[in-house]
Amino acid sequence: QIIKMLSLSRFPQNLLVSRCFSSCCSWPGLSQWRNAPINSNRLWGDTSPQYQSLPSLPNDHPGYVKLLRASSLSELGAIALSTGFHPAPPPSRPEKPVLVSPKDIPSPKECGIPLNAYMLHNLAHVELNAIDLAWDTVVRFSKLHDAIGEGFFEDFARVADDESRHFAWCSQRLGELGYSYGDMPAHNVLWRECEKSSDDVAARLAVIPLVQEARGLDAGPRLVRKLVGFGDSRTSKIVAQIADEEVPHVAVGVHWFVAICEKTGCAPSSTFHALLKQHQVVPKGPFNFAARDEAGIPRDWYENEDSVNAHQLAPVRERLSDIISLEMENAT
């Protein structure tokens, strides 16, 4: 019954085993992250996050609805985790940014936006999508509440809360640089990846936390170095903090993916590879092995000979990429 509910019954039978599970190392900080109070450090101070109280507004104030949308729904207690409603695809979006194909995203020079603001805008777009992805996971799979357990939904509500702070920091810093979210076009790739896994909770975990969010572990340090090279240490500190806080999001994905595999008698490693093949998703390096190891993703889930070679060449490629980016900016 559970296999049918989780849409795992279509897996090849040779993936169904009793206890042949890949060895996964849980992130040591997972319990502390779960038990911590809601983080209200939504303002970026001189060098680190700072507490920001929510303003008190009357219900008829024009900013009230905006406040509710921007704030943590888990903090406001505005969602029932056992709801049976389905989220309406796609989620609501502001008029800007205009969504275009990835190949049509303009360069910093074409946008007339400096490189640091350009990269920060891209990150803000990722964080906004991450909020929607987390809440979509909570609502879309709420029908499995009894089978999975309430902890699953509490974890992803907390992920959404984290992502809302990250978006707030990015938006604040964009404003300090003289820009705002929506000042350049963006793509809709992340939401399309979400739609691929809309009918299968195991696929959702494989595609989103274990591939898409794991890419943030890989890209974060590279982005920090580029910003430092550009001379924007303030933005680099924001990005470094965001990258650190992505580790528990990936760790949550690992935990629940393995838990669901255990419930259904599936080998996590084989199931992960089968799901990625089914949904035509390919993990792309170079990988940040240290951060991925910390989050608990077994290397055999994503590593192959090509990725090992890419990892060895990564420092050279990253340095060249940094030099090219800075030269392009100087040329403008």
Which role does the model predict for each range below?
Residues Q1-K4:
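Short, Lys/Arg-enriched N-terminal segments with co-localized hydrophobic residues
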Residues L6-T332:
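Non-heme di-metal
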